[in-house]
Design a protein with these regions (language model features):
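Histidine-anchored nucleotide/phosphate-binding helix
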Residues: 22-24, 208-222
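Accessory N-terminal region flanking or inserted into the helicase ATPase core
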Residues: 2-6, 14-17, 101-203, 210, ...
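Glycine-rich P-loop/Walker A and Walker A-like loops and their local beta1-loop-alpha1 context
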Residues: 3-29, 33-46
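Conserved phosphoryl-transfer catalytic core
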Residues: 92, 105, 224-240
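Conserved P-loop NTPase-based nucleic-acid remodeling module centered on helicase motor cores
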Residues: 31-138, 147
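Residue-level detector of conserved catalytic or cofactor/ligand-binding positions
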Residues: 261-269
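Conserved helicase core region in the C-terminal RecA-like lobe
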Residues: 63-70, 198-207, 211, 226
């Protein structure tokens, strides 16, 4: 396994270079799977770009996928039956129901529940808690450092109650799309699609902890993982000091991937 970074400024041709590399390798190794992972909104355009880069106009052993589409592909392959996935609209309905039941116990949220878009904001906060691994213990630890008379303390206390009710409702019924990547990470080792494949990640400015855990598993089974990184050529991508330095997100992404495990790092391009 190896990890390769393609570095460059915005508009420098990183994606074009990557797609050309993937196309050339796929023609030399038609027996191998090549997976290009991009943000959900870019999957269709990436498929078009790959087809345009291919001299035959087709991509038989190349797939352009998002993380979620990769999850469905792997689940279909390994025959893993998972609980139904609760989409964003479903989460809004569940959270509205739970908040309604808890209304008398809520101090801050109580007066805002009927405001347009407020439930959606609460849903977004809970989704980020899941993505970034903020469980109840971490939330409690953070709240202990706050004044118990502060607005933020009461608001987090309300969100914690709704979050707990949301988790209890989902248990043994549904999983969220944020949790799907953890399920996928556990299925990676059983997938023939992923074993010995070349996986490219393009168009990301950073990765959430759950995505990092998945990439860690992908590195174990794939032949190579290639990541495009937006950064100035004068910057050292392997030195991340603080979140306010230039290209901090890119440097944080690079250093977090390097730290995943004992990985051979291909020469930057």
């Amino acid at each position: 396994m190896s990890l390769q970074f393609i570095l460059g400024n915005s508009g420098s041709g990183k994606s074009h270079y990557l797609y050309q590399q993937i196309v050339n390798e796929s023609m030399e190794h038609p027996e191998k799977n090549y997976l290009v992972l991009v943000p959900e909104q870019f999957t269709m355009q990436t498929q078009r770009d790959l087809c345009a880069a291919h001299p035959r106009g087709g991509i038989m052993n190349i797939d352009a996928l998002s993380f979620m589409r990769l999850a469905y592909r792997v689940f279909e392959e390994v025959g893993r039956e998972e609980q139904p996935v609760l989409d964003d609209e479903g989460k809004n309905l569940v959270i509205r129901r739970i908040a309604g039941k808890l209304e008398d116990d809520l101090k801050v949220l109580k007066g805002n529940l009927k405001k347009q878009g407020y439930i959606s904001e609460v849903k977004s906060v809970i989704s980020e808690f899941v993505q970034y691994g903020v469980d109840f213990d971490k939330l409690d630890d953070f709240m202990e450092g706050l004044s118990q008379e502060s607005y933020l303390y009461y608001k987090l206390q309300d969100i914690r109650k709704v979050y707990e009710g949301f988790e209890e409702y989902l248990r043994d019924r549904y999983i969220t799309k944020e949790e799907m990547l953890d399920v996928l990470a556990r299925a990676v080792c059983d997938s023939e699609l992923l074993k010995g494949s070349v996986i490219a990640l393009d168009g990301f400015t950073g990765f959430t902890p759950v995505q990092i855990r998945l990439i860690s598993e992908l590195l174990k089974v794939s032949e190579k993982v290639i990541v495009t990184v937006e950064i100035d050529r004068r910057e050292d991508p392997f030195i991340y000091r603080h979140p306010y330095q230039l290209f901090a997100l890119s440097k944080q992404m690079v250093t977090s991937l390097v730290k995943l495990s004992l990985i051979h790092i291909s020469e930057p391009t």
